[in-house]
Design a protein with these regions (language model features):
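Catalytic pocket-lining loop regions of alpha/beta-barrel enzymes
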Residues: 147-264, 313-323
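Divalent metal-dependent hydrolysis catalytic cores, especially in the metallo-beta-lactamase
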Residues: 51-86, 104-112, 132-139, 165-168
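Mid-to-C-terminal alpha-helical segments outside catalytic/metal-binding sites
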Residues: 2-19, 30-35, 60-78, 252-253, ...
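Conserved, mostly hydrophobic/aromatic
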Residues: 36, 94, 160, 227, ...
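Short, electropositive alpha-helical surface patch
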Residues: 89-103, 247-254, 278-288
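Active-site metal-binding loops of divalent metal-dependent hydrolases
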Residues: 37, 84, 197, 268-269
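Active-site gating/metal-coordination segments in enzymes
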Residues: 88-175, 181-182, 228-234, 239-241
């Protein structure tokens, strides 16, 4: 079953995403933390590795003030930047941008475990409390399933775990999910965040589909594994599917496996602009979460991000008690 197969043609109505007043009121009581945004400045004299110049949807500065303009009305009070560059120097660039903008509660950097400078870079970066971990996976032509066997790689991840930092994945497929399961078994005290799980293709063949869900069940047994309900919106024939019910079956399957204590909100802004504007991205997931308890919503939008990333509030409104 491919993810798009979950969307029934009958559900492709152009339903508006207007939340009931009770849901909007409840949402305002929860300080929302967006655990997945990308920051870059396309006006830098030395350029950016991503996005490409011909990417008309993305190639413009994506910096905190622009993000706040889009997200604040939805109750977002903080965000975590996920590095979008393989350049080691961009860890410092991103840390500087994050430090200058208190709406940012931290960042996930880009380092390659096992490389000669990795341990020194990790030791230096972790001294900054805004540095929350690293991202690795299907990005920059990397392959976790192969790299786990390279000298020093696992030791590098063990050092990450010892430092109390988080290991974010990138763009899951079956091969990466298997590698993440292996990682969680080899380093059970490493906090792992599986990003964009709703976007992963569920195999159509019965045996492969069972393996997929068995793998997720095995990952979920580790209490240090979290997943992001990110990259949710989809297009059908070039049109955004706005009916929240079209997403329910797929999201319910993930929710049932991982439970309300291990699922996080992430918008994937501005990469999400390829499919939907921020308002629609947020509204789709908000309507889904509105079917859960208030406690579950609080965990999804706020508390679970603290458990996964150990970020520290920088503003009063990033505390639930202040809302």
């Amino acid at each position: 079953m491919r993810r798009r197969d979950v969307v029934k043609l009958a559900a492709l109505s152009a339903a508006g995403l207007v939340l009931p007043k009770t849901v909007r009121a409840a949402a305002k009581q929860i300080p929302v933390i967006d655990t997945h945004i990308h920051l870059f400045d396309t006006t830098r004299t030395w350029g950016v590795p991503w996005p490409a110049k011909d990417d008309l949807a993305l190639f413009k500065p994506a910096l905190p003030p622009r993000y706040v303009d889009l997200s604040a009305k939805h109750g977002v009070v903080g965000a975590i930047a996920i590095e979008a560059s393989p350049l080691k120097s961009d860890n410092d660039w991103l840390l500087k941008v994050v430090a200058e903008n208190p709406v940012m509660v931290g960042m996930i950097g880009d380092l390659i475990p096992g490389t000669p400078s990795y341990m020194a870079d990790l030791e230096r970066l972790q001294k900054n409390p805004l540095f929350l971990g690293i991202r690795y996976g299907n990005i920059w032509d990397r392959d976790l399933s192969i790299d786990l066997d390279k000298p020093g790689f696992v030791d590098g991840l063990k050092a990450l775990a010892k430092a109390g930092l988080t290991f974010d994945s990138a763009n899951p497929d079956e091969k990466l999910l298997a590698a993440l399961l292996k990682t969680s078994e080899q380093i059970p005290d490493l906090r792992i965040v599986v990003d964009h799980l709703p976007h992963a293709v569920v195999p159509a063949e019965a045996t492969e589909q069972k393996q997929h869900f068995d793998r997720l069940q095995a990952l979920a047994k580790n209490p240090r594994v979290f997943v992001k309900l990110s990259e949710i919106p989809i297009l059908v024939d070039g049109t955004l599917v706005t009916d929240p019910s079209a997403y329910t079956e797929h999201l319910d399957a993930i929710w049932e496996i991982f439970g309300e204590d291990h699922i996080l909100f992430g918008s994937d802004w501005p990469n999400s602009d390829h499919v939907a504007p921020y308002d629609a991205t947020f509204s789709i997931v908000q309507q889904y979460i509105s079917g859960k308890s208030a406690k579950a919503g609080e965990k999804y939008f706020w508390k679970n991000s603290i458990a996964a990333y150990r970020w520290r509030p920088r503003r009063a409104n990033q505390h639930l008690a202040s809302i």
